Regions:
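The −1 position to Zn-ligating cysteines in a subset of zinc-ribbon hairpins
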Residues: 28-29, 107
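Short, flexible, mixed-charge glycine/proline-rich loop motifs
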Residues: 16-26, 97-100
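Active-site-proximal or metal-binding-adjacent scaffold patches in catalytic folds
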Residues: 4-5, 19, 39-46, 130-139
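Basic DNA-binding region of bZIP-type proteins
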Residues: 11-12, 19, 112-135
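Histidine-centered nuclease catalytic patch
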Residues: 34-106
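Short Cys/His-centered divalent metal-binding micro-motifs
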Residues: 34-41, 104-126
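Short, charged low-complexity linear segments at domain edges
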Residues: 1-16, 75-89
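Short C-terminal domain-edge/linker segments immediately following a structured domain
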Residues: 53-54, 61-66, 118-123, 136-139
Length: 139
């Protein structure tokens, strides 16, 4: 995920080098689904949900990266939208200051969002609760 301007100060000065080292460790692929950084893929829908297809028609399990076979593009159920994969570095403990290699993982957009889903839900819930509490002060 891109670093929000308000969080930049939480990252070390050598973040670019740390990021490069994690991408190198991962072979420039998502450490979850194994999709390559910069690959152009289509995400499956319906019967093809939880899969992705590369430009060559190879279909992969979106959770493990296991190759499932090859299909014609016209036979693959998807939205028709192609996505350019951009690897980001996930902090497994959600703490940007903790840049230990074992706390960092190279993930594609889908895998990073899935990894962060529970944390994002908890943060949103806490934000709503805090806003409600502030609103109560002015009633």
């Amino acid at each position: 995920m891109p670093i929000k301007p308000e969080n930049k100060a939480r990252y070390p000065a050598d973040w670019k080098q740390i990021r490069a080292a994690i991408l190198e460790r991962a072979g420039n692929c998502c450490e979850q689904c194994k999709v390559a950084n910069g690959a152009r893929i289509a995400r499956g829908t319906g019967e093809s949900a939880d899969t992705f297809m590369d430009a060559g028609g190879y279909v992969f399990d979106a959770d493990t990266g296991t190759q499932l076979g090859r299909v014609r593009h016209s036979d693959y159920e998807c939205s028709g939208k192609w996505t350019n994969v951009v690897l980001t570095i996930a902090h497994l403990d959600h703490t940007p200051e903790n840049c230990a290699p074992e706390n960092l993982k190279a993930l594609c957009q889908r895998c990073h969002l899935r990894y962060d889903a529970q944390h994002h839900a908890e943060t949103a819930r806490a934000t709503r609760k805090a806003r409600k509490a502030v609103a109560d002060l002015f009633e």
